[in-house]
Amino acid sequence: MNKPFAFENLNIVIPKRKSNSHKGINGRVLIIAGSNGLGGAGIMASEATLYSGAGLVSLYTHESNVKASLIRNPEVMTLGISEFFQISEKFNVILYGPGMQKDEWSNKMLEHLHNLPKESKLIIDAGGLQHIKDQNRTISNEIILTPHPGEASNLLGISISEIQKNREETAKIISEKFNASCVILKGNKTVIYLNQSKEIYICENGGPELSTGGTGDVLSGVIAALLGQNLSIHEASLLGVAVHAKAGEIYANKYGEISLNATALIPIIRKLLKK
């Protein structure tokens, strides 16, 4: 049975911070994103993570993107990666894929998905989805996949029109095929499929204002921050999708549907999460 949900009706609360809390316990998020020439995706994702409450945000990206990231958000610990690196166990959430393409640098980054800290939750978005399709090894961590219809079409080898005819079943099939704990199939009335409970949720917020580049990067960053603050995959997925879509509605009501740029969502999301 499909369960509709909206931001206005969710009863999901980010845990209140204790008076003696510190940055290390409020979410330690690593974002691996941004091939050469696609640095904006990693910058947007990391900014969304930062402004959604994560205590520590690190961005591992192509060396060419480091300067822009540090100018935009000096709070994000940005590292230019060219060779093998070790992923520390300090990260409890890892987001992989925004701004990744099929190139040598991205292929090097892919190798690390099979050597993650066991407790780290993993979000795979955008170019990362192509990478998991192309490799045969199973990733043992809890995974959230966040495809749009085009990416879902590529994952399953069927047409976008077939995807759109049965979005709920598509999300379920992707989850089963790639052993994902959760699949978020983006688009009009975003679908969330939870593998463990077999529940399907359909978001009633949002509209065509979100159909612009970068909004998916912002969404994945928000969800990463919520996971880092000890929400479950279920809670972080529902709240992340709903607050992102509601932010789009608020922007469209004020400025119209056609002028939204993805980073304009971030300050609105910041205010909504305060509630």
Residue ranges and their predicted role:
Residues 1-121, 130-144, 153-275:
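Small-residue (G/A/S/T)-rich helix-start motifs and N-terminal tracts that mark the onset
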